[in-house]
Amino acid sequence: MTNAVEDSGPRDLLFLLISTSRFNRYMPYYTMMAAESLSIEFILYKAGLCFVHCLLLCGAGNTWNDLVDRDIDARVARTKMRPLASGKVTLTEALLWMTGQYFLSVKMLDLILDGRNIWSLMLPLTASIMLYPYLKRPIFSKVFVYPQYILGLAIGYPAITGWASITGSEEPLGDIIKHCIPICLLVFFWCVYFNTAYSHQDSVDDRKMNINSAYVIAGQRIRLFLAFLSVLPLLTIPYIISTINSPWLWVSWMATWTVSIIMQIAQFDSQKLESGGRIHWDNFLLGLWTIAACMVEVGLQKVEFWKNVEGYIKL
């Protein structure tokens, strides 16, 4: 381990630390920009701040995950070359990197919320991020508690941050959380679906080490199980869109997601473990598409497009 670190220059070390944060890869936290709080005047400013906050916090969480799982990762074919698992980054370096990302994310949240409710939002999210890697231990499978549950909560929770950044001075935190429950549920179900598919890539090595993951529920019927999980976010989307009254979102969001998820399940092959990774990638693209669709909706709302269409129809 020592030799690997000594041979790395500062530039190589920086790249290795970045890879522990997954900044060099796609991340589901990017999709948190696709919340209904985007439909206000200063959306771009607030969305940009939320993006940076989520990026930093997700990076810290990924580094923490690699710290806790470094011994497991070293025995899994797909993850054995990760910087911590391979010994290219030391524990001290990773801890410093993680701490820096975390406190920068707190600073960004302070800026987003103007100093309001920072730790009320940050502490539950921090606790879930810290707990996540430990739920992979086999003891939790006995009570049917899987890491995907916590991951779904952690990825859905920042939707509350987005809404609080806009209405926090006018709404109590309890009302903000209540308002965000539908979008949080959507992201929770969605994350459980695509992460179960993603983790199935490692099922062969995971079974050897008795690693806990949601795909163990399905056994040999993983495709049927994924089909069931994929229906849950699709059932949640109509409730969200119906409150916005946007034909555009019915087409760009609901219809697009339905077609995409049907294709994902149709193309999934349990005998080809890499097909789980394909589902994860497809859903990253789906998240980016949803961000774009919501941004278009913001523009349509600003010019009162749907009101004008409704008035034209009445004529």
From Swiss-Prot:
EC class name: transferase
Principal subcellular localisation of the protein: Golgi
PROSITE patterns: UBIA (PS00943)
Mode of membrane association: Multi-pass membrane protein
Cofactor(s) listed: Mg(2+)
A cellular component annotation (GO) from this entry: Golgi apparatus
Family matches, as CDD domains: PT_UbiA_COQ2
Enzyme Commission number(s) of this protein: 2.5.1.-
Domain of life: Eukaryota
Pathway info: Secondary metabolite biosynthesis; terpenoid biosynthesis
Gene3D superfamilies: UbiA prenyltransferase (1.20.120.1780)
Molecular function, one GO term: prenyltransferase activity
Coiled coil: none
GO biological process, one term: terpenoid biosynthetic process
Protein keywords: Golgi apparatus, Magnesium, Membrane, Transferase, Transmembrane, Transmembrane helix
Stretches that traverse the bilayer: 40-60, 84-103, 118-135, 143-163, 174-194, 224-244, 248-268, 279-299
Catalytic activity: 5,7-dihydroxy-4-methylphthalide + (2E,6E)-farnesyl diphosphate = 4-farnesyl-3,5-dihydroxy-6-methylphthalide + diphosphate
PANTHER family: 4-HYDROXYBENZOATE POLYPRENYLTRANSFERASE, MITOCHONDRIAL (PTHR11048:SF28), PRENYLTRANSFERASES (PTHR11048)
Functional description taken from the UniProt entry: Polyprenyl transferase; part of the gene cluster that mediates the biosynthesis of mycophenolic acid (MPA), the first isolated antibiotic natural product in the world obtained from a culture of Penicillium brevicompactum in 1893. MpaA is a Golgi apparatus-associated enzyme that catalyzes the prenylation of 5,7-dihydroxy-4,6-dimethylphthalide (DHMP) to yield farnesyl-DHMP (FDHMP). The first step of the pathway is the synthesis of 5-methylorsellinic acid (5MOA) by the cytosolic polyketide synthase mpaC.
Family of this protein: Belongs to the UbiA prenyltransferase family.
Protein known as: Polyprenyl transferase mpaA
Organism expressing this protein natively: Penicillium brevicompactum
Gene behind the chain: mpaA
